[in-house]
């Protein structure tokens, strides 16, 4: 959702008095705020749209921004920091979705497994959403309590989709708040630690914003972001890459009840009480403390 290798080019003027349906579609695209990233009034901002919606994004003073959209398409934008970190974030504002939309702390990381092909991770701490629960169809990874509410953890895979490194296949990490809200405090260390404990490794942080996302829907939001305490965490210590020959795969338990770890997830090791089978790949011991689905 965030490939910024090119900007949209304005179309030529519409000729004639009577516009065709195709003309209307192109006009809607021209009326959208072009995708961009940068710094505004002390905050990093990121705005991306696929051009399919009539969408307007505006940077306001400080950490505040507004966005409105309609007529379909995919878009996401907000203000925050680059790089992301385990900071405590406060935010407030208004959020009025009509259809599929999220309000979330949203960010990206790179290289969660340094010895493998470079990968990216897209993460969401979802505070509010429209008609579609983003955890639908994702794999449950546990739960964590934060700021008086339960957040449910999930993991999903995106295949050949836009990312900070172009089109890629990558993991999505989710923490979805049971009771929706538009305003409060989010301590990102809580969620980074919970994901890591569930075998969902993060890597090196890229940007982190409090974002509004819309997908073939309509709505508006005006959000004010503050915070910044904490520091960019060092990536969790990772086991050394396996030497040749690789250790033999760990035999998964017989099929039955329970769920298996996703690819790249933890599946064993001394003291590990989670899943010991893999929904994709095979469980391979990296050392006595850590086995992983590869």
Curated annotation (Swiss-Prot):
Residues 1-19 form the signal peptide. It holds the Pfam family Glyco_hydro_11. Its EC number is 3.2.1.8. Endo-1,4-beta-xylanase involved in the hydrolysis of xylan, a major structural heterogeneous polysaccharide found in plant biomass representing the second most abundant polysaccharide in the biosphere, after cellulose. Exhibits immunity-inducing activity in Nicotiana benthamiana. Can induce strong oxidative burst, activate the expression of defense-related genes, and increase resistance against oomycete and fungal pathogens in N.benthamiana. One of its GO terms (biological process) is xylan catabolic process. One of its GO terms (cellular component) is extracellular region. Residues 31-226 form the GH11 domain. GO terms for molecular function: cellulose binding; endo-1,4-beta-xylanase activity. InterPro entries: CBD_sf (IPR035971), Cellulose-bd_dom_fun (IPR000254), ConA-like_dom_sf (IPR013320), GH11/12 (IPR013319), GH11_AS_2 (IPR033119), GH11_dom (IPR033123), Glyco_hydro_11 (IPR001137). Keywords: Carbohydrate metabolism, Glycosidase, Hydrolase, Polysaccharide degradation, Signal, Xylan degradation. It comes from the Eukaryota. It catalyses: Endohydrolysis of (1->4)-beta-D-xylosidic linkages in xylans. The lineage of its organism: Eukaryota, Fungi, Dikarya, Ascomycota, Pezizomycotina. SUPFAM superfamilies: Cellulose-binding domain (SSF57180), Concanavalin A-like lectins/glucanases (SSF49899). Belongs to the glycosyl hydrolase 11 (cellulase G) family. This is Ethylene-inducing xylanase 3. Pathway: Glycan degradation; xylan degradation. PROSITE patterns: CBM1_1 (PS00562), CBM1_2 (PS51164), GH11_2 (PS00777), GH11_3 (PS51761). The gene is EIX3. The active site is at 122 (nucleophile), 213 (proton donor). Residues 259-294 form the CBM1 domain.
